[in-house]
């Protein structure tokens, strides 16, 4: 017999067919929202924070990404949000030098007292990542600034209360796996919060690329029956 298990199909029919060709018919035995109701997972609350920018047109996706990750006020907003949160927090980014390093420096520079702030990316070896995990399990207000590639899967931290999507992502699998980091129940932990940061730079005739990606994430939240709230915040130049 061959058995395959996953919590995150990518939502496309082709992906489902490929897996069924390898393993046979697929069965959905439960849902994340059902596991929450049964008390096996933490209750998830999603705060969608849409940062309203002045209208701006980008010729290609990369131009928009460079604009967003280099936006000082946007990065300060993420810094302030992270430092204001209670509990252990995970800040996820996509690009190490251009964004992750900047966020880490900003957060670490403005933290108060001896609050622990860690920076994890592909260049950090597995042993050090495990040390960070063990320390965070014992802390109550630690911050981990980590790349999606290193912390969206495979890291088991029960004592994690908040996740911040600091970089836009369209990938259904990566988003759901990243949410999975915060759903594990721990001692005295029954609730978790995701802060999904989106950006609206739309003109009258066109939505910007990453806003469309945010709309795709909302579709996923609806499909998974997640509770979410959309809050628009004016990001002045």
Residue locations for each model-derived region?
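Conserved RecA-like helicase motor-core motifs
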Residues: 90, 104, 108-130
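A short beta-strand-to-loop transition that corresponds to the Sensor-1 phosphate-sensing loop
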Residues: 5-9, 94-96, 146-149
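Short hydrophobic segments within beta-strands
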Residues: 5, 90-94, 120, 166, ...
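Long, largely alpha-helical accessory region at the distal end of helicase-like NTP-driven motors
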Residues: 88-89, 226-237
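Conserved RecA-like P-loop NTPase helicase motor core
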Residues: 122-223
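Loop/turn-to-beta-strand initiation segments
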Residues: 1-3, 88, 139-143
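Conserved interdomain hinge at the start of the Helicase C-terminal
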Residues: 56-94, 98-109
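Post-DEXD/H (motif II) to motif III coupling segment of the RecA-like Helicase ATP-binding lobe
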Residues: 1-45, 221
